[in-house]
């Protein structure tokens, strides 16, 4: 009976993506979450890191306009699905 709470706790934790289908779903979620944050005109390209880090999905985004190309990084919390976009990198 004492093991029952432990079992419920394990069942409540998110599953770790380990199958090819789970990783593909993770990449699609990361891409969709990051693209939803782009509020700029222009052609958008995105490169999603296949696995991210332990806690975050990561993507690089580029927005190309007539004025040039802005590059940004997007991170998505794997547990909550919340995504954030950095300010554009400066050209040096």
Can you describe what each PLM-predicted range is?
Residues 1-4:
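Positively charged n-region of N-terminal signal peptides that target proteins for export
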Residues 7, 12-14:
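N-terminal signal peptide c-region/cleavage motif recognized by signal peptidases
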Residues 17-92:
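Mitochondrial intermembrane space
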């Amino acid at each position: 009976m004492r093991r029952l709470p432990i079992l419920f706790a394990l069942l409540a934790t998110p599953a770790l993506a380990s199958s090819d289908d789970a990783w593909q779903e993770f990449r699609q979620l990361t891409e969709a979450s990051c693209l939803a944050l782009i509020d700029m005109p222009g052609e958008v390209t995105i490169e999603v890191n296949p696995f991210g880090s332990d806690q975050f999905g990561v993507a690089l985004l580029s927005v190309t306009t007539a004025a040039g190309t802005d590059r940004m990084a997007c991170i998505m919390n794997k547990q909550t699905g919340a995504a954030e976009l950095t300010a554009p990198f400066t050209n040096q």
